[in-house]
């Protein structure tokens, strides 16, 4: 009996093989089952032969998130930009790759591309205004969009809760025209078990039924409040720490008196009635204690009501993470950090404009404030001739350090005059001129020569060398 069964199995195997070999089209069009890349971890996704790629996509709020996507075999290169929205978090991601995420929580999102001409606000007696999307405007998926204000264009009054995101277990309510984050209504507590009706527990305890018996146990304690993020952040002078978007951010003070006043972590600079700045810890019972504003907004008490208003970020705030190549600087263009080519202002002097006499002229770097277009990147400097064969370009500062003549603090200028290191020799005028006469600093800064004689632009109020 066993031999017969074995023969039957062998016949079936050979039959299957012969059918497969007889039909090569079967192998040609056969495809493996689809991979479920979105369920893999990072290590599993990056594993060899996983058939998946681990790609980053950026949300409108600037959050980079990695997704495990199926490799289409073409390298997952760039594709026409599209948008997808997360149904769980409402985050909108800009999809740049031909390999798209396949998460069950993501769906295609249609970008609002209306124009004011299409809104026809004037026809109904209103005006068209461009507003920022909530909560963020960062990528091509979240541009500004037009709304009708006034008239009968359907704009209507804007809810004060429009730009307010409340913490967990809180919801925003419009109370007398103000946005308030109030606790969500909780379901009524369950009725006590009939076995607990005759049980009276002490303070801080409650009755439960365990193993068919009533007993008193300690009431669960509420979780501790989240840490105050700004307690661990020390902002520079003229900036206060404000928490929004779940992060601590240094924002520029509104009061000019606070520009040069420095406060420790967890404290804000405020100005009293005598216009004197001092450090004060934010009131924990303030109206904004339960209000979390979207990115780019900060909560302020206006008319005794908490309101989310757009807050100016520090200059070039998004540029802090963008490193531009040499000859380029970061500037904010259309709310996005961009690398632009640095241009030399027309007033900048070169060695052709300076007569150093018997001295050598070299262009030395100038410490320009970041983003300044009115500051000369390099300035001319008169130096003693080098005793070596090296030229000035061998030194990173643009001049040679080999100065053995003189006392190191002065430069001979002709037979009579001796100039200091921070001065230039003008033989035609028979005088020494401070190098800072040839440097034009940006507003809010002044020219000061450092210990090596190189002029630099320093912010006003900074102690010079």
From Swiss-Prot:
SMART domains: FOLN. GO terms for biological process: sporulation resulting in formation of a cellular spore. InterPro entries: Dict_spore_N, Fol_N. Keywords: Repeat, Signal, Sporulation. It comes from the Eukaryota. It holds the Pfam family Dicty_spore_N. Residues 35-153 form the DSCP-N domain. Residues 1-22 form the signal peptide. The keyword RNA-binding does not apply. Residues 160-182, 195-217, 229-251, 257-280, 287-309, 318-340, 435-458 form the Follistatin-like domain. One of its GO terms (cellular component) is spore wall. May contribute to the structure of the coat at the interface between the middle, cellulosic layer and the outer, electron-dense, proteinaceous layer. This is Probable spore coat protein DDB_G0283555.
